[in-house]
Amino acid sequence: MTAQPQTLKIRRPDDWHIHLRDDEMLSTVLPYTSEVFARAIVMPNLAQPITTVASAIAYRERILAAVPVGHKFTPLMTCYLTNSLDVKELTTGFEQGVFTAAKLYPANATTNSTHGVSDIPAIYPLFEQMQKIGMPLLIHGEVTDAAVDIFDREARFIDQILEPIRQKFPELKIVFEHITTKDAADYVLAGNRFLGATVTPQHLMFNRNHMLVGGIRPHLFCLPILKRSTHQQALRAAVASGSDRFFLGTDSAPHAKHRKESSCGCAGVFNAPAALPAYASVFEELNALQHLEAFCALNGPRFYGLPVNDDVVELVRTPFLQPEEIPLGNESVIPFLAGQTLNWSVKR
């Protein structure tokens, strides 16, 4: 029997999908990311979305001002695509190194997406320019048709929207974000080097039964919503396969406790404090620790055409207890796996 490893050294990881919010929430949650991750793709869906170069620069400065002393962290900014976005603004931002990618939210698909795109073919000229300049398109892959069941919206998106985009723009780099279904995992595996996907810790660790059986657990509620076990197992098999098309994207999305624990709670899981230990635990369960570094630190940079990080982080087999809550002014934020113990800790 092979002895269990007691330490894991991997190149410093990056988070290819995160919500850092703004103001007090930003300063509260950012250190949990900047302590462990070297870079993060920052989502642009603030209450006033990031749609201009100037607003992206200003937001980046607010993020950098909140990075604790001693942390080395680079926020990678994204442009929020809208029906009326000027292609010149998009191009200028990318060529100046302000925008790393552009984000497509179908209108009303998730938190702060009311400004999103209601007619996707109408913004095909943006996609054409992005393909030309090599700018990645990040997609929240769900249809928003009220007639489509919430558990079917990702699978329907593949056929109705994603496949037509890929057919028309075959060399457009696309990240199918936070995938949740076997349909999506199979689609990415069958794709090519222009298609990648991020996978969150909660979608690898849990399915909809964990959220709904024995009482509703609002801190597992996110969008796309957790699916049935067969989809969870397909995601686990995909990351365990070692395919370089899958990479780390936490979709960490904090909300104040009262906004989650209410009669109409917000979608989002604040998983940044436990992200790397959670991924390590999953890969160990899958006997796939040999693929952990690539998933966390190599596949994403390769897809984006960025260098891998030079420094390393060390995970140690020491129990890691998640706090029950994290102070946020006079309120609090409930972290993913609150009050639970993980087998791995990041060595400080």
From Swiss-Prot:
Alphabetical list of CDD domains matching this protein: DHOase (cd01294)
EC id: 3.5.2.3
Manner of cofactor binding, per the entry note: Binds 2 Zn(2+) ions per subunit.
Pathway of action: Pyrimidine metabolism; UMP biosynthesis via de novo pathway; (S)-dihydroorotate from bicarbonate: step 3/3
Keywords: Hydrolase, Metal-binding, Pyrimidine biosynthesis, Zinc
Top-level lineage group: Bacteria
Reaction catalyzed: (S)-dihydroorotate + H2O = N-carbamoyl-L-aspartate + H(+)
One Pfam family recorded for the sequence: Amidohydro_1
Chain positions recorded as Zn(2+) 2 binding sites: 103, 140, 178
Keyword Ribonucleoprotein applies: no
InterPro entries: Amidohydro-rel, DHOdimr, Dihydroorotase_CS, Metal_Hydrolase
Residues where substrate binds: 19-21, 45, 140, 223, 255, 267
Binding site for Zn(2+) 1: 17, 19, 103, 251
Cofactor requirements of the protein: Zn(2+)
Gene3D superfamilies: Metal-dependent hydrolases
GO molecular function: dihydroorotase activity; zinc ion binding
Membership in a protein family: Belongs to the metallo-dependent hydrolases superfamily. DHOase family. Class II DHOase subfamily.
Complexes and interactors: Homodimer.
Role: Catalyzes the reversible cyclization of carbamoyl aspartate to dihydroorotate.
Record's protein name: Dihydroorotase
Native source species: Yersinia pseudotuberculosis serotype O:1b (strain IP 31758)
Gene for this chain: pyrC
